[in-house]
UniProtKB/Swiss-Prot annotation:
TRNA binds at Y14, Y64, N66, N112. It holds the Pfam family Pept_tRNA_hydro. The lineage of its organism: Bacteria, Pseudomonadati, Myxococcota, Myxococcia, Myxococcales. The active site is at H19. The record marks D91 as: Stabilizes the basic form of H active site to accept a proton. Coiled coil: none annotated. It comes from Anaeromyxobacter dehalogenans (strain 2CP-1 / ATCC BAA-258). It catalyses: an N-acyl-L-alpha-aminoacyl-tRNA + H2O = an N-acyl-L-amino acid + a tRNA + H(+). Belongs to the PTH family. This is Peptidyl-tRNA hydrolase.
Length: 192
């Protein structure tokens, strides 16, 4: 069994914001798997699905970004899952917009949701699907930038990026992060 976590903030006011791209990917992954977020546990919305041979819980923590790790840590402990069973999808300021990268471990890059997950699972050594949102314009607070909404004209690029992130997540679940990284990151570099 695997746990896939899309990071974001609950509430309609955060829909379509850069910071909620993890929720968008989780929603699309569940939709493609024919699953719905019908369960509520660990202060999160959960959808049970199958990705290839793997049973997967897709999670959207409802604790707000800075406390996302509470739900993730509780779920890992409850289901007795290890860090190699965890895939977290989140926005990333350090990646160019619409670029998708898969990595294991590394720093949190100032992302409070990732910081919280690291603190509650005891390590950064889990798979992360990083979805690039780019850097804010000069003199703009990064918090204001990530809480800003994607522009209407960005729909096609965002949709393609979400599909790439869904595929990266699926590969991480089905192949394991190490094998999946070769495919996902090679594709991402080829798109440059």
């Amino acid at each position: 069994m695997k746990l896939v976590v899309g990071l974001g903030n609950p509430g309609e006011e955060y829909a379509r914001t850069r910071h909620n791209v993890g929720f968008v990917v989780a929603d699309r992954l569940a939709q493609l798997a024919g699953a719905s977020f019908s369960a509520k546990k660990f202060a999160a919305e959960l959808a049970e699905a199958r990705l290839g041979p793997e049973r997967v819980w897709i999670m959207k923590p409802q604790t707000y970004m800075n406390h996302s790790g509470e739900a993730v840590g509780a779920a890992l402990r409850f289901w007795k899952l290890g860090l190699d069973d965890l895939v977290v999808v989140h926005d990333d300021l350090e990646l160019d917009p619409y670029r998708v990268q898969l990595k294991v471990g590394g720093g949190h890059g100032g992302h409070n949701g990732v910081k919280s997950v690291n603190a509650h699972v005891g390590s950064p050594e889990y798979a992360r699907v990083r979805v690039g949102v780019g850097r804010p314009p000069p003199r703009m607070d990064p918090a204001d930038y990530v809480l800003g909404k994607f522009a209407k004209g960005e729909d096609a690029e965002l949709d393609l990026c979400v599909e790439q992130a869904v595929e990266a997540t699926r590969l991480a679940v089905e192949l394991g992060a190490a094998r999946a990284m070769n495919q996902v990151n090679r594709r991402s570099r080829a798109a440059d």
